[in-house]
Design a protein with these regions (language model features):
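Radical SAM enzyme [4Fe-4S]-AdoMet core and its adjacent flexible, acidic
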Residues: 1-68, 74-81, 85, 91, ...
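Flexible mid-to-C-terminal extensions adjoining Fe-S/redox cofactors in radical SAM and related proteins
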Residues: 80, 85-156
Length: 156
């Protein structure tokens, strides 16, 4: 077995993401069967963590949900991505303040609204609509202001 039940270390699980050379590999996307298996081993091996799971839940069943915008990724050239696995930039720290960038990111419904699914590795509709642009990568992220339409933003 890869995992030991009585070890004191944590193992971070990341699901496969259709990005880079795997951008069109839809078959790798985590499905209901995969999620059920992950829930099963989470309960069995209490040292497993995922970014979407609640780490303080002693029953090992709680879901925090996707943490886009809450955990940003800043590239060496200053592009601010909503997640290292979602290759969409919401701004650039050399052009805007981080507060302006975060405020803009939370105006996008997909990032503001709760999702139990990892947008990058589980939400097939989000992946098809926003993560499959030609040449899109961590080095050439899609620009949120260009790919999202008016209906994708919250109204104030």
């Amino acid at each position: 077995r890869i995992f030991k039940k009585k070890k004191k270390y944590k193992t971070l699980l990341n699901v496969a993401v259709p990005a880079g050379m795997w951008q069109k590999a839809e078959e790798i996307i985590c499905d209901d069967k995969d999620r059920e298996y992950l829930r099963k081993i989470r309960r069995e091996y209490k040292n497993l963590v995922r970014n979407i799971w609640n780490p303080f839940d002693s029953s090992h069943e709680g879901i925090l949900g996707c943490t886009t915008v809450n955990r940003l990724y800043i590239t060496p050239i200053g592009d601010v991505l909503v997640c290292p696995y979602v290759h969409i930039k919401i701004g650039n720290i050399f052009k805007q303040t981080l507060k302006e960038i975060v405020d803009f990111g939370f105006k996008i419904k997909h990032f503001r609204n709760h999702s139990d699914l990892c947008l990058a590795g589980e939400d097939k509709e989000f992946i098809r609509k926003f993560m499959t642009k030609q040449g899109q990568s961590i080095f050439k992220p899609a620009d949120a202001s260009e790919i999202f339409k008016k209906k994708d933003f919250i109204e104030k």
